[in-house]
Amino acid sequence: GGTSAGAGLVLALIQSLAAESISLPCAIYTGTPWVDLTQAGDSRHVNEGADRVLVTYEGLLQSAAALYAGTIDLSHPSVSPIYGDFTSFPPVFIVAGTRDLFLSDAVRLHRKIRDFNGTSQLEIVEGLSHAEYLIAHETPESYMTYDELRAFFLQHL
């Protein structure tokens, strides 16, 4: 699994493996996933300034997206896996906070997996910004997230 851009990389990798008929993991974890570099999604605007970690998409994140994509269109699944194929995808655990700039990515990812008849568990944590369950790892919200993640993997592995 992975968090933020790492979650996007993991999902793009799984899509590539599936396209090549290479065996897939039994389950994966995505934390506050950045899966759409096109800036689609309501939370990019609503949580602007409310996310205490990322704060804004303008500047650093926008530059990182352009640098990562290079000449590839930002909506291509290799850089924005939300636009890819989720057929035969392993079960996915998704976590995000209500103040996360990428909350919409998490919600849309969950829906996309379900649209492909896949298994997805979405955990939204009240009041948390981007990846705060990892940053402030000794909080009740973090412990709750880790407990949910543990239960998910015990169920699917």
Write out the residue ranges for each language-model feature.
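Alpha/beta-hydrolase superfamily serine-hydrolase fold, recognizing
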Residues: 1-157
